[in-house]
Amino acid sequence: VVKISDSTDSVHIIENGVREFLDNYKDTVYGGGLVAKLGIYCGKIEKLEEVVYPLVSRIVAEYGLGTDTILKFHKGNKQYPMPADSQMQFDILDKSISKIRIVLLVQIGKEGWDCRSLTGIILSQEGDCPKNMVLQTSCRCLRQVVKGMPETALIYLNEFNAEKLNTQLQQQHHISLKEFESGNDKRITLK
């Protein structure tokens, strides 16, 4: 499911995306004990630490989850050092021992990040990822977790990132975002 917000307020987009993810995937556990995860790209460490983390912490508490289900993953700066054990938590995201549900990211995870249990992505503002990487970043959540089983995913975008995604889909796959969204009407079984 691709959701495009007409709001320019990044906080509003993130709040709606997190709530929709938790409403639909909070209790989702895939084969092998992998819990569904949501990735939120934040653009800057300060935004992650000062805006997104407090917002997401409040929302998960409303859903009966603790802050231990949120991973802040960035390389740190002078004001906000890299969170303790975050690299280890990131490395085990796709293992049954990981209980992380929401991953907050800054400039990480766009290349070579293969997390099958990633079920949703939020790109709420321009600059959350490089302009030429919107397709690759937003489609991180489209990997099959259990072979042959029907699965869904959530991609939450602001209008800027939706336009970039549409352009990149047309350039690289010769389809529009509208065709991409309607793809679930023509389901195929992957072998």
Please identify what each model-predicted range represents:
Residues 186-191:
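The feature captures the C-terminal accessory region of ATP-dependent helicases
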Residues 76-177:
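Conserved RecA-like P-loop NTPase helicase motor core
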Residues 68-69, 177-179:
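Short secondary-structure junctions
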Residues 183:
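Residues forming the flavin
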Residues 5-114, 128:
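Conserved C-terminal RecA-like helicase domain
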